[in-house]
UniProtKB/Swiss-Prot annotation:
Keyword list, A-Z: Ribonucleoprotein, Ribosomal protein
Family of the protein in this entry: Belongs to the universal ribosomal protein uS2 family.
PROSITE patterns (alphabetical): RIBOSOMAL_S2_1, RIBOSOMAL_S2_2
GO biological process: translation
Name assigned to this protein: Small ribosomal subunit protein uS2
UniProt keyword Transmembrane, yes or no: no
Species this protein is from: Methanocorpusculum labreanum (strain ATCC 43576 / DSM 4855 / Z)
């Protein structure tokens, strides 16, 4: 699917339409939650919802600007989703954030007696479904929540949504790469990293 077929034009994009499409960032789901209706570009004939990558591009910029207000060590990146683990960890390591990949231990944000207890100021999750526990705890602690959301996700308790395919390996690599690059730019740092640096070989 080319940009001409979708008819999308981006204003000062982080990457080209073609690069977003090649990574599959626009590929949504066949199930829709009304919370995500504003992020739908169109519905394909087979019932697949296409994500509006114009809004993806805008939201990545917005989230990076928001995160740049925080000390990196106060940002907590969490993902249980397999394909999100490598790029999320890369993002956290690059900017100096806290991270947790794999199964989230209940109480990590709420029980100071746990060995892995952390006290961040803001939380980023890869999927509100798989990462529901950390969202619940962040809300209990009054922390803002940023989430990568697909068309089937509910966004209650999410403060900032990045609309994206949050199931595909390449899509997650692209979004975390762009978030890293834009965050560093907000901090006045020019990065030579490429999206390939965020792609796991597995």
């Amino acid at each position: 699917m080319t940009d001409n077929e979708l008819g999308i034009e981006l204003n000062e994009p982080l990457v080209s339409v073609e690069e977003y499409l090649a990574a599959g960032v626009h590929i949504g789901t066949q199930q829709k939650d009304n919370d995500m209706k504003d992020f739908i570009y169109r519905v394909r004939s087979d019932g697949l919802y296409i994500i509006d990558i114009r809004k993806t591009d805008e939201r990545i910029k917005q989230v990076a600007k928001f995160l740049a207000r925080y000390e990196p060590a106060k940002i907590f990146v969490v993902t249980s989703r397999q394909y999100g683990q490598y790029p999320a960890q890369k993002f956290a390591d690059t900017i100096g954030a806290l991270s947790h990949v794999g199964r989230f231990i209940p109480g990590t944000l709420t029980n100071p007696k746990l060995p892995k207890y952390v006290e961040p100021s803001v939380v980023i999750v890869t999927d509100p479904i798989g990462d529901a526990q950390v969202i619940t705890e962040a809300v209990q602690c009054g922390m803002p929540v940023i989430a990568l959301c697909d068309i089937n996700n509910r966004t209650n308790n999410v403060d900032l949504v990045i609309p994206t395919n949050n199931k595909g390996r390449k899509a997650l690599s692209m979004v975390y790469f762009l978030l890293t690059k834009e965050f560093l730019r907000q901090k006045g740092i020019v990065s030579a990293m490429t999206v390939e640096d965020f792609e796991s070989e597995f």
